[in-house]
Amino acid sequence: MKFFVLTIFPQFFEGFINTGIVSRAVKKGIVDIKSVDLRDFTEDKHRTVDDVVYGGGPGMLLKPEPIFKAYDSITEKGHKPYVLITEPWGRKFDQKFAEELSKKEEIMIICGRYEGVDERVKSIVDEEVSIGDFILSGGEPAALVIMDAVIRLIPGVVGDSESLNADSFSNDGLLGYPNYTRPAEYRGMKVPEVLRSGNHKLIKLWRRWKQIEKTAVRKPELLKKADLSDSDKKIIDAIKKGLSFEDFLKKYKV
């Protein structure tokens, strides 16, 4: 997959490209990330990328010319990226959106700055995207979030692909279950006995219980959207009745 990031701060992405699974994906040739400096597409000696707002108002806007020229320089080489622009009112970026984008071959992200971009830029945009209801200094941090979430979904990037299915919001959309590693006891806190039992069927059930329990408390709306099995519904009923996991096992003779 190719990413083209249109920005006035290309250096912002250097650490991201050279760190962790993203770096490995780049070295393997699975992912290619190009930071495109909008200032390279200006024509004045000051390399101006912004200007005042027509009609008056605070702040400055990114000018259309550098963005269109940067876009043209990419598409003229035969690239056909799916174009995103970071906007606070855009489509909410979530796991489902990330999964959709992971199927694309090429993605362009236009990073806004100042008061945003000239509205005419939207004529080349496929979707406006927001990572949350808050304001950032620019679209660069949002672009990092989007790329990181998408890249890890691309086949071959994450070593253990099964781990993706256990992530929160993946697969059936519920939150993830708690995980533990060694030592078995630390500062009086013990790893749940079930996880050390070797009973894989019981471990799977416990993890499902914890997923549903966490989701019910923190994001109950996700349960309404999830495709729940009969076993899941029994777990929900038990949680509503205040039963513990152990009580649940006894009641349903699991």
UniProtKB/Swiss-Prot annotation:
The record's subunit annotation is:
Homodimer.
- Reactions catalysed according to its record: guanosine(37) in tRNA + S-adenosyl-L-methionine = N(1)-methylguanosine(37) in tRNA + S-adenosyl-L-homocysteine + H(+)
Q: Where in the cell is it found?
A: Cytoplasm
Under the heading InterPro entries, the entry gives: Alpha/beta_knot_MTases (IPR029028), tRNA_m1G_MeTrfase_C_sf (IPR023148), tRNA_m1G_MeTrfase_TrmD (IPR002649), tRNA_m1G_MTases_N (IPR029026), tRNA_MeTrfase_TRMD/TRM10 (IPR016009)
Q: Which GO terms describe its molecular function?
A: tRNA (guanine(37)-N1)-methyltransferase activity
Superkingdom: Bacteria
CC terms in the record's Gene Ontology section = cytosol
* Residues the record lists as binding S-adenosyl-L-methionine: G112, I131, G132, D133, F134, I135, L136
Spell out the family assignment given in the record's similarity comment: Belongs to the RNA methyltransferase TrmD family.
Q: Which lineage is the organism of this entry classified under, starting from the top rank?
A: Bacteria, Pseudomonadati, Aquificota, Aquificia, Aquificales
User: Which PANTHER family does this UniProt record tie to the protein?
Assistant: TRNA (GUANINE-N(1)-)-METHYLTRANSFERASE
Q: Which HAMAP family does the UniProt record give?
A: TrmD (MF_00605)
What is the name listed in the Swiss-Prot or TrEMBL entry for this protein? tRNA (guanine-N(1)-)-methyltransferase
* Pfam families xref list: tRNA_m1G_MT
Look up keyword Transcription and say if it applies: no
